[in-house]
Amino acid sequence: MIKTLKNLLKQDKKRYTVPRKVQDVIPVRRIWKDGIFQVGSRFSKTYQFTDINYLVASREDKEQMFLAYSELLNSLDSGATTKITINNRRLNRANFEQSILMPMRGDACDVYRREYNQMLLDKATSANGIIQEKYITVSVWKKDIEEARTYFARIGADLITHFAALGSKCTELDAAEKLRVLHDFYRQGEEAAFHFDPQDMMRKGHDFKDYICPDSMEKSSGCLKLGEKYCRVLFLKDYASYIKDSMVTELTDFNRNMMLSIDVVPIPTDEAVREVENRLLGIETNITNWQRRQNANNNFSAVVPYDMELQRKESKEFLDDLTTRDQRMMLAVITMVITADDKKQLDSDTETVLAVARKHMCQLAVLKFQQFDGLNTVLPIGTRRINAFRTLTTESLAVFMPFKVQEVQDKGGIYFGENAISHNLIMCNKANLLNQSAFLLGVPGSGKSFSAKELIAFLILDTTDDVLICDPENEFGALAAALGKETATVIHMAAGGKDRLNAMYMVDGYGENNPIVEKSQFIMSLVEQIDKAGVGPQQKSIIDRCTALVYQDAERTGKPATLCDLRNKLLEQPEEKAKEIALSLELFTTGSLDIFGHESTVDLDKRIVVFDIHGLGEQLKPTGLLVITDTILNRVTLNWKKGKRTHIFIDEFHVVFENEQSGIFFNSAWRQFRKRNGYPTAITQNVEYLLDSVQASTMLSNSEFVVMLNQAFSDRAKLSKLLNISDEQMSYVTNADAGCGLIKYGSALVPFINRFPKDTELYRLMTTRPGEGVFGSGNAS
């Protein structure tokens, strides 16, 4: 027998004692606050790792992931046993309702909150409803806890590095988190009741097992009853010669509470080589003896029997894997436990799982009279009581790939649809990201406006955050007026209109550094919108000088500075170019766009402000967009000082990058939004125009949240290159239905489906399809 295996079996050897109570069945002797458990004579620690997009990856990417996972398996310590566990946990409805549904507020908007909550409940009911968690548990024999801590500190750092190479995040579980995993399995349906306080436990003299164990355990030859639930432990008895990498995914793609564990015992290479050489020597001896017998019978042309030849060939290949291909010998045990509400359901589910295994030419079998041992083996405790070992190489073990698809289910998140692969809800909390900048991209008719309105509706109904919207197509006013009631104002910007905005308005703290310099940059952008020849160095100097003089006069007189004041100051200057700039600004002061040249006449202090620039026409929209962005920047600065979050939505975002100066100003404003607790969202259908600008491309690539709906062919190619998305993943934005596409959330890429029920008042407010809803502007000002 291999020395490592012999030592392992010796360490695991334990005298059987009849359990006198339910707690005795749980094999954990002691726990420490940092998550280390003592199980028998060994110490164990569990780490949780996140899923990666393996199923939707390209063939090349899958190969890279496979090699990276193989490298992780190769790095496992031969002195320890490693258990990889996939835990399917059903979403608790009570917890779901508490964490996701909107609370009623007793106002006129409760009717919309009920509609939204009902939509979420319907989606959750029709969805998979299973949360899949993945753990890796390392157990090792050490003399004392200090040695164990030192060992796990080193192993933990190694695991985190290797999982990071895969694109997965690996984190340690402390005692409370690990006990919660066990509690949620032993006491299914009572997940919300878990509470563990070590100080309180010691003060009361309780055992930690009291907090997790079921009320009762009953065993029979082929199943267990834990409280009111039935469970059955299976093990992989027979392996196929060739196994697909989708086998584990298919076994766990099951809408039930279940666990699957792979126990791995790595064998040191020198022992493995010695073992295989001995086996090969035995085979060669058998072949030699067989040939000697044939020669004794004068049969000198006899061919070596096929089974002997096959044994020799496989042994040589195995030895070659160990010595030249850096493979390791691994001993593996695969076990799984399925649970059900009654025995009949358990039998039916067992047959379903057995059929999946048969499909892959493997045989799963029920552990007869070993159910308790099997249960303790499959749970992420750190013990192994089943010795149905199968000898594998690193590559053949890596075929049991635990990865499937990334899920985004953040606590306190906002609903963005359901995962197109797992059908679980996608809940995104942008506060968890490195930055909160967002882009919403898609061709006309792909559902951009609807997606933006759905997010705005959630923010208005469920938060107290301010919402500022730049609306070039008169689409958002009705929604804001209906949901905002007294807290919303819709500003109609049109040539000769009564609503005016002061383009020179500037709050205390405006800009990143020098506010006068920032405002000068804004004025240059404004002039450039009129004079397509651009702003030269001489004009820049004049604008900078006059802007400073205007604000000095405003500070002295106590009157707000306006574009009229700036134009008058320009006319006072001796340079001829100053007169030219003044002539350019005439449009905004005494011309048809004087709505930006005087003091503001609108209420900018409301919680929801919609800037409707539809009336400006196509030629003047970029100018209106610039002034509104500057106004929004002032509001974000004020909110930042109050400690309030602001959400900014800017439609037709691409137009501001048609000119150099306006692009520079907008890039600066975008940075300031992020730094001042602003959550900016850019919406555009012209992705190609956006990507032609270096600044806009940089903003897009640096954004942590990007929603991609159906994309044109040329846009797909550019987005794929910019965001490093595979062709397989880009297929989700190719001829996609409205509301379907791909979400880039931090490092995660999740295909999604988002269809809102049409028989609701919210749908009527959000849709832009002719004849289906309210398409136009409300007036809540």
Model region roles, listed by residue range:
Residues 485-491, 695-708:
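A short helix-turn-beta junction within AAA+ P-loop NTPase domains corresponding to the substrate/partner-engaging
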Residues 467-470, 673, 679-685, 708:
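Structural recognition of the conserved hydrophobic beta-strand(s) that form the central parallel beta-sheet
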Residues 451:
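Hydrophobic positions on the alpha1 helix immediately C-terminal to the Walker A/P-loop
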Residues 448:
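Conserved lysine of the Walker
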Residues 458-468, 486-487:
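Post-Walker A helix-loop "phosphate-sensing" segment adjacent to the P-loop in P-loop NTPases
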Residues 52, 59-78, 85, 89, ...:
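P-loop NTPase motor domains
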Residues 440:
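Hydrophobic anchor at the beta1->P-loop junction of P-loop NTPases
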